Every structure is written in structure tokens, then in C-alpha cells.
Amino acid sequence: MIVAVIPARGGSKRIPRKNIKEFCGKPMIAWSIEAAKASGCFDRIVVSTDDEEIAEVARSWGAWVPFMRPRELSDDYTGTLPVIRNAVDWINQNDSQVKYACCLYATAPFVSPEDLQRGYSLLKQESASFAFSVTNYAFPIQRAIRITESGRVAMFNPQHFNSRSQDLEEAWHDAGQFYWGTKEAWLKEQTLFNERAVAVKLPRHRVQDIDTHEDWVRAEWMFRAMKSKE
């Protein structure tokens, strides 16, 4: 069985009810559910939540919510791995054996069905443990600066002060959208970022952090602009 697991707890602090707040005409989580359905990759689209209202909204958009997430996995400090591990364990014990699982964030409206398909293909082709979305930094991280306690400026890597941008290695970061993995990887690995993982590259304009009200407004502008060109 191939499953998508969408983590969506109810206790978001900076943007209350973030996972079901309306984003460009739909509850935020609906965009992830619809992308998963349109990809054709999944036998089940599961939402892991501790919140009855989120569960109801998720079901209304076609997701499966067969259990409520335990309280101990629903606080501000629980990471992605134990949440997906819990869902995979539950499905293995109560439904069918999972072969591949994809963690798809509820707050990833920019994810496309094609992105999910590419991730699945890469996972299998490369015999990888994980395949997850990344995008590149807009500026060379080797030339990053910090502000000291006295308010002065210092480079993290002073040896690159005179380096040309085109001579520096390109750096990438987690795009925070989706993470494909084998059942074994989800159940046994301690980190997603290891030598057994492969990257699914996304363009920067489709990678938007949505953590504040300003982020939300900017993301809606970008989303509408992107959709108007399709």
C-alpha cells in the first residue's frame, strides 16, 4: 500500500486554525489533499490530527481520518518522524501493510501533483530511503554574515570575502512540502537528511514559508499570480 500522511494538529499558535483557515477560496489543507488525489500515487490519503474540526474538514475533502493522533504526539515539540511513524504503525496494524509513505504538509498549497509523482519516481529509481522537496538559496551561504552582540558585522566564512558567487558551491534547503520514504525508513531512521536520501528540486517561487500573517498575505498573492498564468 502507498499512503500519503498529512500531519495537521489543531494547536497552531502564530496563525490560529492555520490548517483549515481559508486560503484562496479553500481550507488550507484542501490544497494538499487535492494535490495528493490528482497525483494518482496513493491508495490512501490519511490525515493525522488531534482536532475533531480538522478531521471533519479533511473528510469532507476526501481524506481518510481513521484515528485521532495521541496527545503526546500533538505538542509544539514533536517532530515529523514520530508522527508519520505513528500513522504507518496504525495502518500496518489495522488496515494493510504500507510499502511507501509520503508525508505531505497541510500547509503546502504550492505543491503540485507532478512534484509528488517526481518524488515517488526518484525514491524508487535511486533505491533511496527518502526523497524530499528542496529549493536553492537565493544568495551564496558561504558569504553569509552575522551581527555580533556589539552590533558589528562578521562573516561566517571570511575566507570567501573575495570569492565570486559563480565559483561557490550551490546550497539547498528543505522546502517543507513533502517527504517520500519507504516503510522501513519511516520506522527505523532517526533523520530524513542523510546519505540515503535524494532531493526533489523545486523552483524558489513555489516554496513559501507561511508562519505569520504577512507570510500568509504574500503567499496568497503569489498563489493567485501563479494560478492566473496556468
Regions inferred by a protein language model and the residue ranges of each:
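Conserved core of the sugar-phosphate nucleotidyltransferase
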Residues: 79-82, 109-196, 201
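Short phosphate-binding loop-to-helix
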Residues: 53-100, 111-114, 118
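Hydrophobic helical membrane-anchoring modules
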Residues: 199-201, 206-230
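Short aromatic-hydrophobic micro-motifs that form the base-stacking/packing surface
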Residues: 102-104
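N-terminal glycine-rich phosphate-binding loop and ensuing alpha1 helix
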Residues: 1-48
